[in-house]
């Protein structure tokens, strides 16, 4: 594994609650943030960092991702938790930041919505939303 490890959404929430230096980075696209929703960290006195791993609509990896995120999160020792829809993009982002020298990068393995259920709907069988963690939608 090329990053610190995988956390399920409940473990991620616990770490964010216990360690004020921990940051949650949502690497989904702007349309996903707008139409699907966002993790709500206001009860912890902060907000998720929004930095897309891929550029919409082409969905190519953003070559500036690491540099832009490093400007926002200069503490290379703080825990950084990456979340996407279901864990794939966030895993790649965690690996990229680890390769750049960040020491405690975690993937929220089930993501915000988790995998689809038998009816091909997300957000019901796994992920941040299904875990009953706080989230908001515009």
Task: Name these PLM-found stretches.
Residues 1-23, 30-79, 90-138:
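Rhodanese-like catalytic fold shared by cysteine-dependent sulfurtransferases
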Residues 82-83:
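Short, surface-exposed ligand- or partner-binding patches at beta-edge/loop junctions that are enriched
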Residues 87:
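Conserved G/P- and acidic residue-centered "switch" motifs that form tight phosphate/ATP-binding loops
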